[in-house]
Structures are given as C-alpha cells and as structure tokens.
A protein has these predicted regions:
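Phosphate-binding site recognition
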Residues: 1-224
C-alpha cells in the first residue's frame, strides 16, 4: 500500500489519523503480506503524526527516509541530462532561484536561456510559478499567514534574527512561535545556529530556502 502526499488527506474533521490507526492496528499489522509506505512533502505533519506519534501509531515506523533537495552538483547533473547547454555560472544562478527542488527544475526548457526560463515561469501572466509562493505555504502549513510573516521578516535580515527579534516583528510568542519555528526548520525553510558559549535565547534563525529568498527579492515587489 503506497499513499503519496498523505498530509493532504488529513483534512479538517476527516479523522484520518484515527482511521489509519484502526486500519493498521486492527488489521494490517497482523498480516505478513502488507507493506505500508507513506510519503508527504509536509514534513511537520509527517513527523508529528507518524514518526513522533504518541497515540495509536506510536513506534509503528520500521524506517523513515528524509528525501532532501538536490545539491548544487546534483542540479548540474540533472540539467546535463536535460541537455541544457548552460555554463556553470548559469547553473549556479538557477540553483539560487529554484534550489534543488526536482519539480521546479523539471519545468526548465533546455532550449531557452536561464533568463528566458525565469521570465516565462515566474513573471509571465500564465507562468506556472507565478502563484507558487502562496500555494506552497498554504499546502504545507495551517495558518499559513503566520509562517509567511516569519519568513518575510527573516528575508529582510540576511544576518539572521533571534527569537526575541522575530517575536517583536510578528507579535507572537510562546508555544505558537516555537511550533512555527520548529516546523519551518523541519521543512528546511530556515536554519538556526548558536555561537559557542551563547545562551539559547541568542540562537540565530536565518532564511535558507532559495525560492523564498528569490521570491522576496524579485517577485513579491513585482506582484504587489
């Protein structure tokens, strides 16, 4: 049994997780001919509801695989297989726009230059990537506006921000902010670092998602 993008099934009032618990514990777990594979791009949902589940699915995971985006080298190999004749500088620029997300890279037309591809995908009225930002955050997070407010603040501070600084900008603190920062980190949108000898409150959060950085530098001001 293979379910792709499982988090999308768990809609409000669906009781999907409870149903999955009953399916596995009440029937599938006793069978030797069942292999159950679940995948999803909403990392925070997968961790909370499957990997770190404290209910009926606790300790039911045999193995987990976190599929990371392509590295810069892997992006180069992928584009070469698409017969892109770009030099390494263009490939680097492409990586800084799209990151290592295979779906984004699959949209590239190798017959066009990087500039032509970016213009077609991001800035034309019918561009596939034109509305990707809102769709992405709304698909991954409930209360997406709160998550967007955090990445927007971080996009304006390339040296990073402390939790206290983020809280002052977005007006949220406590457990809510902790959950938002944790989920953004799980999904590789942000990173955190702490200098040796510094206290936890001095932890620095930085925006690291290339597409989000590109969006706030070029697309947000264009669409507004």
């Amino acid at each position: 049994v293979f379910i792709d993008e499982m988090p999308w099934i768990d809609t409000q009032k669906s009781d999907f997780v409870s149903a999955l618990e009953n399916f596995w514990n009440g029937w599938a777990a006793r069978r030797s001919d069942i292999v159950f594979i679940a995948s999803g791009s909403a990392t925070s949902w997968m961790v909370d509801n499957l990997i770190e589940n404290q209910g009926g699915l606790h300790a039911r995971i045999t193995s987990s695989i976190y599929v990371r985006p392509f590295t810069l080298h892997e992006v180069e190999e992928y584009l070469q297989r698409k017969h892109c004749k770009w030099d390494r500088y263009q490939i680097l620029q492409c990586y800084m726009v799209m990151g290592g997300i295979p779906f984004y890279l699959s949209l590239i037309d190798p017959r066009q230059s990087l500039v032509q591809n970016v213009d077609r995908l991001f800035f034309s009225h019918s561009g596939i990537m034109r509305g990707e930002f809102d769709e992405l955050y709304n698909a991954l997070f409930s209360n997406a506006e709160l998550y967007i407010s955090v990445v927007k603040a971080l996009a304006q501070h390339h040296d990073g921000m402390t939790r206290t600084e983020i809280s002052k900008v977005i007006g949220v603190n406590g457990g809510t902010l902790t959950r938002v920062l944790t989920n953004l980190e799980r999904c590789d949108f942000i990173s955190r670092s702490q200098n040796f000898g510094c206290k936890t409150k001095d932890t620095i959060y930085r925006l690291m998602d290339f597409y989000t950085l590109f969006y706030y530098k070029f697309i947000a001001q264009d669409t507004s």
